[in-house]
Design a protein with these regions (language model features):
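Carbohydrate-interacting regions of secretory-pathway proteins
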Residues: 11-386
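Bacterial N-terminal signal peptides
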Residues: 1-7
Length: 386
């Protein structure tokens, strides 16, 4: 990465702004390879499960069931707080047929969800009557749980189907009695003022195999009926279905997903209005940061930072100050004794790169005087000669 650096002993390239990739535009508040873009949080990965032992969740996961208690769950067929009749056996929660659905006490929206489940070892029934349950996202969108190991049924009702809407891309089930894993990325449909502003999608991996690829959520799932568009809530519980079979679950956890562009996220292409607002916010933050770098003995760090703010949003006072600082820098360089000026070769070439960047992305015009004068100095000193 090209970073603009000064010759000051206490400043490094990493301390100074980067003038590198394409500048922000009307739909992207960040520059390409933007040094101001926040670093992603560090997450310690978990471990994979075996049949004998559930894996360890990642460090930022919210644990919904760890094999020891049902304190985060309640019955779905009663008032809030009604205890479930599901039971815990050997580190797994087991559906008691006829007891009703179970749901989380908490509600959440867009998530990465991990669920492990096992149908009974003893095979009983066929088609939809064999090891049937379901994982309901927001309590509305069912990812089918079913023992389809050598057990055909209608495709949009097989294990890992978005029930009644999308058949799985593959049948990657293990034999009955063994634990299966679902890893789900769920993005709910987003509604504002009664209108859908962002569709919902779900991606599912079954035992590590991609079986739902960014499948469009057409509405609430249901049996024998076509899904219809509907207003989705921003948050809802996770539900597990009682379909009359003693299906077991273990190692259930989720990670909240970051907001999308339509709800304030800043990754991807934003609206013109949202981009403008974010760029103004970034420019103001960078200007505030520049104030901390003010140092008459070494003005370059402050000048670079102020100049960088102009890449995000124009500000007349800041533009004027950068032009004054740039002119002062070039005048000082020109007036130095030859031996002292020679020591500024690398620094001057870096400053020229900044000026070129600012001109290239229309922060300053082609006639930007400090740039022209600096180029003349560099040429007269043969500093571009290799």
């Amino acid at each position: 990465m090209l970073a603009i650096a000064s010759s000051v002993a206490n400043a490094t390239a990493a301390d100074l702004p980067h003038f590198y990739g394409d500048a922000p535009d009307e739909h992207h508040p960040w520059a390409v390879h933007d040094g101001n873009r926040p670093q992603p949080p560090i997450v310690v990965p978990g471990t994979f499960s075996t049949q004998e032992q559930p894996g360890k969740p990642p460090s930022d996961a919210v644990i919904l069931f760890d094999g020891t208690d049902l304190s985060k769950w309640e019955a779905d067929n009663g008032p809030a707080g009604t205890p479930t009749k599901w039971v815990i056996k050997n580190g797994a929660m087991e559906c008691v047929p006829g007891s009703g659905y179970i749901r989380t006490r908490d509600k959440f929206g867009d998530i990465q969800l991990h669920v492990e489940w096992a149908s009974p070892t003893k095979v009983e029934g066929e088609s939809q009557g064999r090891g049937n349950s379901g994982v309901f996202l927001l309590g509305l969108v069912e990812i089918q749980v079913l023992d389809n190991y050598h057990n055909p049924t209608y495709a949009d009702g097989m294990a890992a189907a978005v029930y009644g809407q999308h058949a799985p891309l593959a049948n990657a089930l293990r034999p009955p009695g063994e634990f299966q894993s679902y890893d789900i990325a769920f993005r709910r449909p987003i509604y504002r003022d009664g209108r859908e502003v962002d569709p919902g999608y779900v991606t599912v991996f079954e035992n590590g195999v991609l079986v739902e690829d960014h499948a469009l959520i057409e509405g609430e799932t249901g049996h024998m009926r076509r899904a219809k568009p509907m207003h989705f809530p921003d948050a809802g519980p996770l539900k597990l279905q009682d379909h009359g079979n003693p299906v077991r679950y273990r190692n259930i956890w989720y990670r909240p997903l970051p907001p999308r562009e339509s709800e304030g996220g800043t990754d991807g292409a934003l609206t013109v209005e949202d981009t403008k607002a974010k760029r103004a916010e970034l420019a103001a933050s960078i200007r505030d940061d520049a104030q901390k770098l003010a140092n008459p003995a070494n003005p370059l760090p402050e000048m670079f930072r102020l100049a960088e703010s102009l890449v995000y949003a124009q500000d007349d006072a800041t533009s004027q100050k950068v032009q004054q600082m740039a002119a002062a820098y070039v005048d000082t360089l020109e007036g130095m004794p030859p031996d002292q000026r020679a020591q500024k070769k690398d620094e001057a070439r870096h400053v020229r790169e900044v000026f070129n960047y600012l001109v290239r992305f229309k922060v300053f015009p082609d006639t930007f005087a400090p740039r022209q004068k600096l180029q003349q100095i560099i040429k007269s000193q043969n500093w571009d000669k290799k």
